[in-house]
Amino acid sequence: MNPSTAQARVVVDELVRGGVHDVVLCPGSRNAPLAFALADADRAGRLRLHVRIDERTAGFLAIGLAVADRAPVCVAMTSGTAVANLGPAVVEANYARVPLIVLSANRPYELLGTGANQTFEQLGYFGNQVRANISLGLAPELSAGSPGDMTSLNAQWRSATCRVVVAATGSRSANAGPVQFDIPLREPLVPTFDDDGSCPPGRPDGKPWTHTPPVTFDQPLDIDLTPDTVVIAGHGAGVHPNLADLPTVAEPTAPPAANPLHPMALRLLRPKQVIMLGRPTLHRPVSALLADPSVPVYALTTGPRWPDVSGNSQATGTRAVTSGTPDPAWLRRCKEVNDHAVAAVREQLAAHPLTTGLHVAAAVADAVRPGDQLVLGASNPVRDAALVGFTPHGVQVRSNRGVAGIDGTVSTAIGAALAHDRTGGRTIALMGDLTFVHDSSGLLIGPTEPTPRNLTIVVSNDNGGGIFELLEQGDPRFSDVSSRVFGTPHDVDVGALCRAYHVDNRQIEVGQLADALDEPHEGMRVLEVKADRSSLRALHASIKAAL
């Protein structure tokens, strides 16, 4: 067995032992030893391999798999720009705390600075965006007469791989996130003709080489619930049963609220204190409340970092130790304004003469059912789901909220669907046309690759960036400029794009969406709904006026 083959087999075996169920592989020459080892593990049923040609989409496919499966996922690639293309996915994984392992093959380090082809200083390329940069080191030449060398190397390689998994899952830090595992590989890069497919042994019974129990991170925080309190539950919020009775503005990716409070209802209330769960990312009324220096904010998170954009948090912890009882009058008032806000949104939607992205979001929100998984685009769709009063009881909701980019959303949805397929449930993804077009190469799934069994991508197509209609850039004063440089109309034929990737698709009206989503189907499909963005500003103004 040559050194690179031995090294790759040990790494793959130890990754499986550490809980890796899925690996995304991008083709290349330098990572050939890893590719052979991964293919062997896939054939043996030890992991599921997904081959992709674009590292950018591969990274987000891995994020979708990791988030939905709650397990570390590797993405393996060759040296050079292949590694650099993982940048956006690594940044998202950092801030969303996703256990993404970048398995980057490299040339021998002595070639750095020599002008060797496809070579750059890739170890450490991601800087402080990763939890760790770990190098396996170049495998030495192996001698058949020195079996002790292989025994020592096997232990070193397995130990290093365990460090990678522990850093990615946060087993010792309570802070999961991306890790770069850089492996310089010497030639030959393919198994020898007489190779018997063996692998140096790991621990008995399939255990990892170094067992690391998950760390417990517990910081109780005393909070008196007597003052009028609202809970703001953002991305990554934990479950807090002792806060369930409090009015809660919950983002779609947060645990569903038992006592929901519409985000637009905050303008009608004067809370005396706020309990912030996770990291709020969506609503301006929420940001304004958290920035109010007269309102104490208590931050509860599931890890060592806590958000505090305005510097207004008075205390942090991981769980609340509560005292006092909420005023029943306050709870009644919050319920009244929530019901009023939800009704106002729905009434204005019904009265609006044109179909907008908000209408599409309402139709999707009404169509999902317990057991579903819903993936929301990071621009308007995730906000629209909250505005239409969506409370996802029994529904797993995903959205890339780490740094909230639109890139990689198609791939994230496919990865999440592939993981959710194991439950037998369906996955629905809602995204805008820019988000869809931006990651359209994510639709490319080769004929030999695992394909989602039940994924519907709903594209709300308003031919551009509808979110800018609602921001300052969409002010009518700038109409002569904003339509082009912010709206960015593209005139892409979504149906033709889908056909190029052999993806089933059709265009429907918003009123047909509920029935279409309820149709039995197999595989992946796209439902396109044409929408208007020119009237979004007026629609939102009418909702605010109704409140």
From Swiss-Prot:
GO terms for biological process: menaquinone biosynthetic process. Pathway: Quinol/quinone metabolism; 1,4-dihydroxy-2-naphthoate biosynthesis; 1,4-dihydroxy-2-naphthoate from chorismate: step 2/7; Quinol/quinone metabolism; menaquinone biosynthesis. Binds 1 thiamine pyrophosphate per subunit. Its EC number is 2.2.1.9. CDD domains: TPP_PYR_MenD, TPP_SHCHC_synthase. GO terms for molecular function: 2-succinyl-5-enolpyruvyl-6-hydroxy-3-cyclohexene-1-carboxylic-acid synthase activity; magnesium ion binding; manganese ion binding; thiamine pyrophosphate binding. It is an enzyme of class 2 (transferase). Its cofactor is Mg(2+); Mn(2+); thiamine diphosphate. It catalyses: isochorismate + 2-oxoglutarate + H(+) = 5-enolpyruvoyl-6-hydroxy-2-succinyl-cyclohex-3-ene-1-carboxylate + CO2. InterPro entries: MenaQ_synth_MenD, THDP-binding, Thiamin_PyroP_enz_TPP-bd_dom. It comes from the Bacteria. HAMAP family: MenD. Catalyzes the thiamine diphosphate-dependent decarboxylation of 2-oxoglutarate and the subsequent addition of the resulting succinic semialdehyde-thiamine pyrophosphate anion to isochorismate to yield 2-succinyl-5-enolpyruvyl-6-hydroxy-3-cyclohexene-1-carboxylate (SEPHCHC). Homodimer. This is 2-succinyl-5-enolpyruvyl-6-hydroxy-3-cyclohexene-1-carboxylate synthase. The gene is menD.
